Amino acid sequence: MATDVQLADYPLMSPKAELKLEKKSGRKPRSPRDSGPQKELVIPGIVDFERIRRALRTPKPQTPGTYCFGRLSHHSFFSRHHPHPQHVTHIQDLTGKPVCVVRDFPAPLPESTVFSGCQMGIPTISVPIGDPQSNRNPQLSSEAWKKELKELASRVAFLTKEDELKKKEKEQKEEPLREQGAKYSAETGRLIPASTRAVGRRRSHQGQQSQSSSRHEGVQAFLLQDQELLVLELLCRILETDLLSAIQFWLLYAPPKEKDLALGLLQTAVAQLLPQPLVSIPTEKLLSQLPEVHEPPQEKQEPPCSQSPKKTKISPFTKSEKPEYIGEAQVLQMHSSQNTEKKTSKPRAES
């Protein structure tokens, strides 16, 4: 009985079964998936961005069944023999032969690597950075380009004033020197010293200059009232454009050398537009132009006089036609035959 109990407690087993039990009881080998580093515990409330980036960069293992039909393989054979027109193109050289050009741009990042602003907790911008529309139509601040235009107009006006001052200085230098010595005036019967005469001339000259300058200043103020608009219009002609945006862009971003060239052109244009003094045409020139107007009718009358000068000569009076002097007046008596003809013609006309 004791032996039966012992057998029931310890049943008989074959050697194969024992080996299987040993295998089962042993530690299982790790699979390739389990070979990676074990996940660490994550404390709530703390975000480790480096760990997220590593997880996103590591490619997930894909089984062959996940590939869709028509997807290109990344095998070296297919990548080598498949055409890539976006990377390799041919352009023509000067002789017309095709030349291979490689556009080696970095590969675009997958969508999974792009972090959204909501995930990172960063405030997002609605307008994309590097918007092509912003490059085509740049938003120029109105105050900036207006300030540049005002500065350019002030420089043009300053240069024109400098030129006028230089001209006046030259005119003053060209004036004749003071006459030395005193002169006798027949009106007063006294000697006038040279200093007083020079002062009188200066005052008269200054009075004329002040009158002319006041006239010119009034005209210039009227013309330069819209000075900025005038400069803007001249810039349109210089740059050969009608677009206000192009002129605004030029005012803000043009190099200084180009602005200096444009300033010289603006200066010459404004100097031509300014009015000339009223005394610019001398009186001699006007007098010389007056006979030229009356010359054509005189030329028409001259040819008959030149052709028959003898006909115009006065024939000598006959004895019967000699005038009689009554005081200072000359009286010429006509023939009696002529008087009778006149008398007969009068009653005929009356009838």
Curated annotation (Swiss-Prot):
Q: What is its main location?
A: cytoplasm
Alphabetically ordered keywords of this record: Cytoplasm, Developmental protein, Differentiation, Spermatogenesis
Give its localization. Cytoplasm, Cytosol
GO CC terms in record: ciliary basal body; cytosol
One GO biological process term is: cell differentiation
Among Pfam families, the record links this protein to: SPATIAL
Provide the residue span(s) of the region labelled Disordered: 16-40, 167-186, 195-216, 292-351
> What InterPro entries does the record point to?
TBATA-like
Which portions of the chain have biased composition (kind: Basic and acidic residues)?
167-181, 292-302, 340-351
Annotated signal sequence is: none
Task: Give the similarity note.
Answer: Belongs to the TBATA family.
Task of the protein: May play a role in spermatid differentiation. Modulates thymic stromal cell proliferation and thymus function.
Q: What is this protein called?
A: Protein TBATA
Q: Tell me the gene name.
A: TBATA
